[in-house]
Amino acid sequence: MDVIERFCKIYTDICQISPAELESIYANDILFIDPITTHRGINEVKDYFANLLTQAQSCQFDIANIFTCSYNSSQSQSDVSHVVNWTMTLVLKNNAKVITLDGTTQLGVNNDRIIYHKDYYDLGEMVYEHVPILGFIIKKIKGKLAK
């Protein structure tokens, strides 16, 4: 099983991830970026997931498709070798509301380890729209813009 297959398997249910599994897919010098923050190195990524696990009741990814990009073997850390499209279903422990979010991840792979991981998703859809008053306002604005 190559690193992309292991990545997809692990991300099926993030709440079941162990630090050893993270080490099996991410390089020691991983650069992990999402719309909220940036993590450098496997220890920061493990801390990020440990924090996520304290807050999430469940977090599952449905991988829609994976695209392989052409790249050369002397790639830099930010060179993208794969693009993964997914739908995340998240339930937080303090709020049983289900959050469903579509997103894309760019991955860079070298020596069967992921050295670059960058997530793209609508942060408003993930966070702001679930704050009662703010969510109402954002949904109203989106509705007016869609007309």
Predicted features, each with a name:
Residues 3-4, 34, 89:
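A short, structure-level motif marking secondary-structure boundaries and short turns
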Residues 2-5, 40-44, 136:
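Generic recognition of short, well-ordered alpha-helical interface segments
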Residues 4-25:
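Short acidic-aromatic low-complexity motifs
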Residues 4, 28, 97-98:
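Short hydrophobic/aromatic segments of transmembrane alpha-helices and their interfaces
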Residues 55-60, 68-147:
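A beta-strand edge to alpha-helix "cap/lid" segment located at domain peripheries
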Residues 1-2, 147:
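Basic/polar N-terminal segments that are highly enriched at the extreme N-terminus
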Residues 20, 24-74, 80-82:
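A solvent-exposed, acidic/Ser-Thr-rich amphipathic alpha-helical stretch
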